[in-house]
Amino acid sequence: MATKKYHFETLQLHVGQEQPDPTTDARAVPIYQTTSYVFRNSQHAADRFGLRDAGNIYGRLTNPTQGVFEDRVAALEGGVAGLAVASGAAAVTYALQNILSQGDHIVAADNLYGGSFNLITHTLATQGITNTIVNVNNLEALEAAIQPNTKVVYAETFGNPNSDVTDIEAIAEVAHRHNIPLIVDNTFGTPYLIRPIEHGADIVVHSATKFIGGHGTSLGGVIVDGGTFDWKANADKFPTLAKPDPSYHGAIFADVAGKAAFVTRIRAVILRDTGAAISPFNAFILLQGLETLSLRVERHVENALKVVDYLSKHPKVPKVNHPSLPGHPDHALYQKYFPNGGGSIFTIEIKGGEKEAWKFIDSLEIFSLLANVADVKSLVIHPYTTTHSQMTPEELAQQHITPSTVRLSIGIEHIDDIIDDLAQALDKI
């Protein structure tokens, strides 16, 4: 499909399997439920292991079902290559571990998903990797946070849980001026609404569990290589990609894989050694979700904007944190980066405190109380006591998470039913 520029809705259905399955003529992508692959002869096996011949070696590294999924997400994001792994957390961890090691430093946004925040501030810190957490939209603070040993700037298109909007272009300009790549988590944005690589991001990560899968059935993560960062021009800073790798007889991934060096090294080294592989079945299920991504996201956004309008006028909801509102500090960025709308995951403040927030949540009937977002079903949770509960009071305040904060993930049910459910729950507090 490379000879013609197709629209998103077409790409999400066809990339990676432009022709029927060559063995069975099946139109649907088969589930290749196998652990390993037969080599034609000993030379063929040696060439595969030596990276001289691209192809399947072992199920921990590659799988044909997985390969279609990777190619499709990469195409939708405008990247050169993709790598699917077992979860979104694995995708974030591997992307950072690929260039960070003891003695290095990361600058990260202060509005991250709680799991990513803990990974950066606690887990990576135990490995000798220091961090500075800042409002990355404050470019002066971002500049001040960058140190000689800073290897990456990390942010999300929409912050979690408040859906703050990241100024990707401005942040990328600062990072690149310091010869540092920008990694962006586009889970909440989705490639249907925004493609961070087009705005200057170098690497994009996803929890495919969320919008890509869309139905709350399968875990998965994806890393997309934009192919835009020149690792060899910064070889001393990024030796894992631009200098000989001793575990591959001195191969240099920037030479062996070219623009796809970033994800190739993760697959060949980190995934090989640590094994957070996605199963063929999960890759298949996530492909089914991907094929309807545009349709679902349109409905998510349409419903969310109507809910925002309703709640912003309700006397028991003193605050709605959504960038579509003219009074939101990121409203101008929202208009710039999301001309077709976005942000079906956001927070509200319930009048009162934790008691009232819990009463509201427990009174909802359509909304499910669970630790996920971006499902076709509407979801709700209390971040202060769940998803962000490991944070200190200072960290919670920095992210504007209070005992009265409630996170909503608006699904694709009929909008009247969603609003009626919110109304009856608010009536009970």
Enumerate the language-model features and the residues they cover.
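N-terminal "arm"/small-domain region of PLP-dependent enzymes with the aminotransferase-like
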Residues: A2-N63, D71-R72
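Conserved PLP-enzyme active-site core in the AAT-like
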Residues: A2-T3, P20, L83-H314
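Conserved N-terminal alpha-helix of the aminotransferase class I/II PLP-enzyme fold
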Residues: N41-A90, G115-T123
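Well-ordered beta-strand positions enriched in small/hydrophobic/aromatic, beta-favoring residues
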Residues: V153, G221-I223, V320, F346, ...
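Active-site beta-loop-alpha junctions enriched in small/polar residues
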Residues: F158, T187-G189, L325, K351, ...
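Short hydrophobic/aromatic beta-strand micro-patches
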Residues: V224, T347-E349, S409-G411
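Conserved small-domain helix->loop->beta segment predominantly found in fold-type I
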Residues: T274-A277, F281-A283, Q288-T292, V297-R299, ...
